Curated annotation (Swiss-Prot):
Gene Ontology biological process terms, A to Z: autophagy; inflammatory response; innate immune response; negative regulation of Wnt signaling pathway; phosphorylation; ubiquitin-dependent protein catabolic process
Organism: Danio rerio (Zebrafish)
Gene3D superfamilies in the record: C2 domain, DNA helicase RuvA subunit, C-terminal domain
Entry's free-text remark on domains: Both ATG8-interaction motifs (AIM1 and AIM2) are required for the association with ATG8 family proteins.
UniProt keyword Repeat, yes or no: yes
The protein, known as: Toll-interacting protein
Keywords, alphabetical: Autophagy, Cytoplasm, Endosome, Immunity, Inflammatory response, Innate immunity, Repeat
The keyword Repeat is annotated on this UniProt entry: yes
Family: Belongs to the tollip family.
Length: 276
């Protein structure tokens, strides 16, 4: 109900102010930007809490069908797995036979069973040129502790599976159950801008639910006795002496994938050495 207040200029009637007084209603596009930003923050805070495991990808080498450079070609690889993007160093003057021997450690989100790989030619004075690409399905037997060493066909300007091949060595490590947290639904509330206050939730408007991960503390996991011997520096050095042509990080990755089993690691490294 309106009230009357006396001022120097006379009586003034003051009524109830509407709920949207001095508020700027955002457009649908602005609301979507806010929701996307909140979802991105939740994903960032969540980190690897919702991951199913860790995938190790060793990008060894590639045999390309054509040199697309004017004088030389400097290829590098880009891998997209889930929301993450990884890159190898540039193989300077690698041309049609680039070698990287780069080990990439990826966290695998639940439900993700493949990744996308692209090869680019690094350019100095123009945009990097995409040479080849392929879609790789993560082998099921990786979860059994095996190491997969395969050549995958590349697609490109020459046609599907006609741009050459790339050699990848993959292993998988499962994250202990005590270190994983189930993702919880996150409520994303539509907001409006209120002058002097900022963005505030809109009363009476239902929130949108997003299956993100909320920031939370990691539970203290009880120490578990290791079932296999850890990778010792002596074993690593011995394997490095046996395979001097292989990169040290590649040997370390294979040894870790075999859970410190030196004999099994030697068999896997012998298969890799035969391909080189």
């Amino acid at each position: 109900m309106a009230t009357t207040i006396s001022t120097q200029r006379g009586q003034v009637y003051i009524g109830e102010l509407p709920q949207d007084f001095l508020r700027i209603m955002p457009t649908q596009q602005q609301q979507q930007v806010q929701l996307d930003a909140q979802a991105a923050r939740q994903l960032q805070y969540g980190g690897s809490l919702g991951t199913a495991g860790r995938l190790s990808i060793t990008v060894v080498q590639a045999k390309l069908a054509k040199n697309y450079g004017m004088t030389r070609m400097d290829p590098y690889c880009r891998i997209r797995l889930g929301y993450a993007v990884y890159e190898t160093p540039t193989a300077h003057n690698g041309a049609k036979n680039p070698r990287w021997n780069k080990v990439i450690q990826c966290t695998v989100p639940p439900g993700v069973d493949s990744f996308y790989l692209e090869i680019f030619d690094e350019r100095a004075f123009s945009m990097d040129d995409r040479i080849a690409w392929t879609h790789v399905t993560i082998p099921e037997n990786l979860r059994e502790g095996t190491v997969v060493d395969e050549w995958y066909s590349l697609s490109g300007r020459q046609g599907d599976d006609k741009e050459g091949m790339i050699n990848l060595v993959m292993s998988f490590a499962t994250i202990p159950a005590g270190m994983m947290m189930q993702p919880q639904p996150v409520v994303l509330m539509p907001t409006v801008y209120q002058q002097g206050v900022g963005y505030v939730p809109i009363a009476g408007v239902p929130g949108m639910y997003n299956q993100g991960v909320v920031p939370m503390g990691m539970p203290a996991a009880a120490p578990v006795a290791s079932q296999s011997a850890p990778c010792s520096e002596e074993d690593l050095k011995a394997l490095q002496d046996m395979f001097p042509n292989l990169d040290k990080e590649v040997i370390r990755t294979v040894l870790e994938a075999q859970q410190g089993n030196k004999d099994a690691a030697i068999n896997s490294l012998l298969q890799m050495a035969e391909e080189l």
